[in-house]
Amino acid sequence: MADLNKLAEDIVGLTLLEAQELKTILKDKYGIEPAAGGAVMMAGPAAGAAAPAEEEKTEFDVGLTDAGANKINVIKEVRAITGLGLKEAKDLVEAGGKVKEAVAKADAEAMKKKLEEAGAKVELK
């Protein structure tokens, strides 16, 4: 039981960058996908019927591909969007990756516009 408590403390103590690396490891090595609510779920077998290709996507992930030359302004925008602390926002900007996940289309486009105005290169997935 002490090992589980230690593991829980270690997970809670992860920085945003470390949590992102853990998510990647769990996905790549073990096939565990993160659920929308932040919980972890196992990847199940493929469904028999595929979703229609014409369905419009309503939720997007806002991804930072390049911080550009004006990194300070990008860090400020990332902090404003995510509510992260200065160090966490700086680490995220330097490493790149998802700024926000499962965001409504209008909000995702607004975030993209703000980050691009700050000098970053952003993609919506």
Swiss-Prot record:
List keywords of the entry alphabetically: Ribonucleoprotein, Ribosomal protein
A biological-process GO annotation? translation
GO MF annotation list = mRNA binding; structural constituent of ribosome
Q: Does the keyword Ribosomal protein apply?
A: yes
User: Pfam families, alphabetically?
Assistant: Ribosomal_L12, Ribosomal_L12_N
Highest taxon listed in the record's lineage: Bacteria
GO cellular component terms, A-Z: cytosolic large ribosomal subunit
Instruction: Tell me yes or no: is Ribosomal protein among this UniProt entry's keywords.
Output: yes
* SUPFAM superfamilies, alphabetized: ClpS-like, Ribosomal protein L7/12, oligomerisation (N-terminal) domain
What functional role does this protein have?
Forms part of the ribosomal stalk which helps the ribosome interact with GTP-bound translation factors. Is thus essential for accurate translation.
User: What is the annotated quaternary arrangement, including any partners?
Assistant: Homodimer. Part of the ribosomal stalk of the 50S ribosomal subunit. Forms a multimeric L10(L12)X complex, where L10 forms an elongated spine to which 2 to 4 L12 dimers bind in a sequential fashion. Binds GTP-bound translation factors.
Q: To which protein family does this belong?
A: Belongs to the bacterial ribosomal protein bL12 family.
What is this protein's name? Large ribosomal subunit protein bL12
Report the source organism. Answer: Cereibacter sphaeroides
Gene name linked to the record: rplL
